Amino acid sequence: MSPNPTNIHTGKTLRLLYHPASQPCRSAHQFMYEIDVPFEEEVVDISTDITERQEFRDKYNPTGQVPILVDGEFTVWESVAIARYVNEKFDGAGNWFGRGTQERAQINQFLQWYAYTLRLGGGAFHWNIFGCLIYGEKPYSPKFTAEQNKGRTLLYEAMGTLENYWLRDREYVCGDEVSYADLAAFHEFVSHEAGKIIPDRVWQGFPKIAAWFKKLSERPHAKTVSEWQYTNVGKIIRGELTASMFKRKTAVLKGTEVFSGHNHGIPYLNEKAEDYFKRVEKEGAAVA
C-alpha cells in the first residue's frame, strides 16, 4: 500500500520523510510545495517495522512518527514545527503563520484547538478504514463501533465550532488569506472524504465548511498531495487492499487518531451516539 519512494528535488539540503496516509504528513508536504522550497521527498513505509527500529528512532525521532524534516545535521519533527521552521528559514509569506502578533496568536490558537478536536476526530476515519484493514476486518466493521462513534462525535462537535466560529464571517479559518491552519484542517477532511465518513446529508448542514473545503481542494498542490489517499482508501473500500499489506498490526496505529479514549464527547451528551448523529444530520451546525 505504500508508494514508491520519490526524490523529486534530488541533491538539495532539505529532506522530508513522510507517508501520504498521514494527515499531518500531507499538510507538511503540501506546505513545502506551497512556499516553493527545494527539498527531497522520502516515503517511509509505515506498513513495516521501520519506524519501530531503534536506529530509526535514534537518528530521526524518538516517537517513530512521521513527518520528519532533515536539514543537514538538524532534524525537526511534528508537522506544525516543520512548517514553521521552513517558513522562518526561507522567509515565507506572512499569511502562513501571521504577519503580526495578533495574527500569529490566532493561527497558533487554531492549531492548538485543532490538535485536540479535529485531529482526534480522525478516529472516525481511522476506525472505519485503516483500523479495520489492519485487524483483518472489512471497512466500517461493527467490531469497532464504540471507537467509530467516539471519533465521529468529536468530529461533528469540531465541525460545529469550525462552521459557527472559525468560518463564521471569513473565507479561511484565520482570516481572508490561507494559512497553515487551513492546510492542517483541510487534510483531516481529505481523509474523511476519501473514506466516505461524512454523509451528504451532514455536509448540507455545514455549508461554510463545504465551501471552504472546495476552495482548498482547488489549490494547485492539494490534488498532488492528496491523490494517494483518495486512490488507496478507495481500493480498501472496494476490497482491493487487504491486511496482508501490513507486516505488523501496530502499523498506522501510532497517530493521535488511535487514542479515541480521549474523545470525551459521548459521556456528557446524555444521549446515545446514534441519536446524536441523527440530530446532526437533521439540524447541522446548530446541534454539533
Curated annotation (Swiss-Prot):
Enzyme Commission no: 4.5.1.3
Subunit structure: Homohexamer.
Family: Belongs to the GST superfamily.
UniProt record, GO biological process: glutathione metabolic process
Keywords on record: Cytoplasm, Lyase
GO cellular component, one term: cytoplasm
Catalytic function, reaction form: dichloromethane + H2O = formaldehyde + 2 chloride + 2 H(+)
Lineage, highest ranks first: Bacteria, Pseudomonadati, Pseudomonadota, Alphaproteobacteria, Hyphomicrobiales
Residue intervals of the GST C-terminal domain: 100-252
Protein's name in the database: Dichloromethane dehalogenase
Pathway where this protein functions: Xenobiotic degradation; dichloromethane degradation
Pfam families documented for this protein: GST_C, GST_N
Gene3D superfamilies (UniProt xref): 1.20.1050.10, Glutaredoxin
Gene name for this UniProt entry: dcmA
